[in-house]
Amino acid sequence: MGYEKIIRTMRSLVDGLELDVLEVVPEGEIKGIFQIHHGMSEYKERYLPFMEYLAANGYVAAIHDCRGHGKSVKIKEDLGYLYRGGARALVEDAHQLTRELKEKWPSLPLILFGHSMGSMVVRMYTKKYDDELAMLIVCGSPSKNPAVGVGENIARIQKKFRGDRYKSKILEAASFGSFAGKFKGEKSRFSWCCSDPEVVRAYEQSPLCGFTFSIDGYEALFQLMRECYGTEGWICKNPALQVLFCRRSRRSLYWRSAQVRAGSTAYAPGRIQKYQRKIISGDAS
């Protein structure tokens, strides 16, 4: 099946920030819409092969560079800076794209997929907007970090003296140091991202990948973790929503098996009727 690739912009309703959007639209009969939210320190075109696969199988695939990523920045130095929108802006931007997609294809079911940081965005999204979705896919969700409060305190102190645009190596080390240490001795400091060395090389060489978050970005990240693991504020207008939690068995940044069970069971506690957990063997990202 052929497809059309569309690149456009979307002006955020939160603050007017221009967000870059990519859509891959099948030429034949369309079965549904598959909306993707990417992870931290990457960009939308990394998902293009997957989107082309979806389009070849009859699904509209859509993704935006979330604020502070890819082309959704005012200047290149703003990579990792979320323009003080916080976790709320990430969620509202994603919902805005949902509404635009459903206006184009009002009769089609919409599946929302989030990877890594994006998995926390889509989980927080469903606190308010679960009735927009036919299915939610939570992929590679970071484990709940008990040291979030410590990170928030470091961010607060550094912001006072450095400002919220400061790229904090201390916060980066505190957030990911123990994980990166498990890959010590590998050829690349990004070896954790994939078992395929070509993918790792492309990630390492891209100026749009692997950048350090600003203090503003880390504050949003910590807020996402608090919100998506919290038990309060779930409206749950769609208890029939199907939810799939999935992770690679050897991606140790993400949930261990017990954490997958605990995280999915705690999801919208007592209200979601149908969810599934899947741990995929292997170590490719």
Please give the residue ranges for each predicted region.
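Conserved alpha/beta-hydrolase
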Residues: R46-E77
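N-terminal cap/lid segment of alpha/beta-hydrolase-fold proteins
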Residues: M1-G28
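Short beta-strand element of the alpha/beta-hydrolase
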Residues: I30-G39
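Short beta-strand/loop motif that positions the catalytic acidic residue
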Residues: F245-R247
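Alpha/beta-hydrolase active-site loop
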Residues: L82-K102
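Alpha/beta-hydrolase-fold enzymes
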Residues: V122-L208
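Active-site glycine-rich loops that stabilize anionic/oxyanionic intermediates
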Residues: H38-E42, S116-M117, S249
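Alpha/beta-hydrolase fold nucleophile elbow
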Residues: W105-S116
